[in-house]
Design a protein with these regions (language model features):
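Short acidic, glycine/proline-rich loop/turn micro-motifs
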Residues: 55-59
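Sequence/structural segment immediately N-terminal to covalent heme-attachment motifs in c-type
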Residues: 28-54, 68-80
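Extracytoplasmic electron-transfer domains, predominantly the class I c-type cytochrome c fold
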Residues: 60-115
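Flexible coil segments in periplasmic/lumen-exposed cytochrome c-class electron-transfer proteins
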Residues: 1-30, 91, 95-96, 100-133
Length: 133
């Protein structure tokens, strides 16, 4: 019973921390800073440091219409992956990590100046995960 109670308490603490992080008012700078690390760990091998990808194999994120202007599709691709392509789902990342890496790509390589520059917040990711009725 003690082990179970400890597990329950850990889960409650995780849920509280997640709620705290998703409700926080994140600045663009905070998301970009965190997103740069997430990108380096999860994205750079395919999309490259400069966001140019590998022509004919992995698409560029720099100048991408989706990254520039289609926030809902941008979230969907990271959450669902792209069927028939090498892009897998990254739904195992936390809401904060997903929001940060998407914001990082939307703010990097000239994308902020050429697109809508809109940030993605952890709350956007939580909203995406809600069941669609």
């Amino acid at each position: 019973q003690d082990e179970y109670d400890a597990w329950i308490n850990d889960k409650k603490e995780e849920a509280f921390k997640l709620a705290e992080l998703t409700e926080k008012e994140w600045t663009t700078a905070e998301l970009v800073e965190r997103g740069e690390g997430v990108y380096a760990t999860n994205c750079v091998a395919c999309h490259q440091t400069n966001g140019q990808g590998i022509p004919g194999i992995f698409p560029a994120l720099a100048g991408s219409d989706i990254v520039l202007n289609d926030k809902p599709k941008n979230i969907e691709i990271l959450m669902e992956g792209v069927q028939g392509a090498a892009m897998n789902s990254f739904d195992y990342l936390s809401e904060v990590e997903l929001a940060a890496v998407i914001t990082y790509t939307r703010q990097s390589w000239g994308n902020a100046e050429n697109g809508d520059g809109e940030i993605v917040t952890p709350k956007d990711i939580v909203d995406y995960k809600k069941p669609k009725i």
